[in-house]
Amino acid sequence: MSVCRQLLVRHRGLDPTAWTALHALARLCGDDPPAALARAALWEFTWEGDADARLRSWVAGANWFANPNRDRATWRQSAGDATDLEAGAALAGGGVGSAGPGAYLVTAWRGADDAPEHESAACRVLGRPVRLRRGQVWWLAAAAGDAGRILAPGGAAARLLANPHSESARRVVGALPVPLLGDEPEGADGGAPGGERR
């Protein structure tokens, strides 16, 4: 049976990149500004069989995915699992930590979402084939209204948070699915810049 686990890695404190992007978006979005923005590295591990405990133990000690002095790592195995992104979100009014609904923008370098060195190491440690993919997740909450609308494909927020020339981007409204990174061909729904998943 195929198993997929997501690892989301975010800053424990204020993420300066998210804070800067949040204030840039406040200028771009005019009357509908975001209230909070968070960013996390996304890693997806896929394998066959029972290796979950060994994988988590290796990742915690490897220091390749998260720096324990700076980062918070959250494991997910289904869409119902928390992402913990809102707890680390930069707030427009200053500070960190948000609550309530939001929307996600998931980005990945087109043609380069694999992580071959990390994947080879995971295969050696687990003693089985492992598929490893990487991307980035942004979580945005609106000051008022619909966060998903702020992240609309082709909108100012999507263009600021993802480079349309080199990254695929998809908006996710609702729960973040597991798995999320896939083999969509260029131009498929959810695989091209500005794609969407609900």
Predicted segments, located by residue:
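Core nucleic-acid recognition elements
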Residues: 1-198
